[in-house]
Amino acid sequence: FSPAKMGYDRVRIHMDSCDFCAEMYEADGDEADAALERFDFSRTEELILPMLRDAQAAAGRPLKIMLSPWSPPAYMKTNGERCHGGSLRPEYAGRWAEYICRYIREFQARGFAVERISLQNEPKAVQTWDSCVYTDEQEKAFLPVMHAALARNGLDDIEIFLWDHNKERAFERASAILDETTRPMVAGVACHWYSGAHFENLDMIRSAYPELK
């Protein structure tokens, strides 16, 4: 983060637990709490924010943050658990979007600059840790719900990124979701570097959607 080193100016942070955590946790796992009144940011406050503050101190400037979920709360999912895939139950799409907005506001309330979100980390992966599957159709259906929630919460400057998975299928996912209605809602396509080269997919995205990051 130091300008004398690599000079990183962005970080990606998980919402709720992920595979880097010692145990699974949720800020609000209470199905009865539709208003998120018992939303508890303390795990992030205690375990993540100190590292973020240290990174910002090393950088000498605010870092731009991307927030990504590994899984919605277990009760919102078809399999009733955070791990082993499952999908977001459609009836909880609106509440899940508000949950993500709440995370953004908690970071902002502490002076951190959230720049963007992805809709789901690795939406094709079924893992033994926190994971949630979105088909093309499911991610496309959730996109306008999330976009509307951001606007409703005064967060319409937050960028939405699709995919957030390996780059060999990035163009396939982008082209399945983006049309004249959804394209203005999306700022970019997030890619992981895990498998092979497949750089042509990034070239195809750049050619077909030159405005995307």
Give the ranges of each region predicted by the language model.
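N-terminal catalytic cores of secreted or lumenal carbohydrate-active enzymes
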Residues: 1-114, 140, 144, 148
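Active-site neighborhood of glycoside hydrolase catalytic domains
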Residues: 94-116, 123-213
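Active-site-proximal beta-alpha loop/turn segments in soluble metabolic enzymes
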Residues: 78-88, 121-134
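Functionally constrained cores in energy, signaling, and assembly domains
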Residues: 10, 17-19, 120-125, 191
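Short, well-ordered beta-to-alpha junction loops that form the rim of enzyme active sites
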Residues: 16, 68-70, 119-122, 165
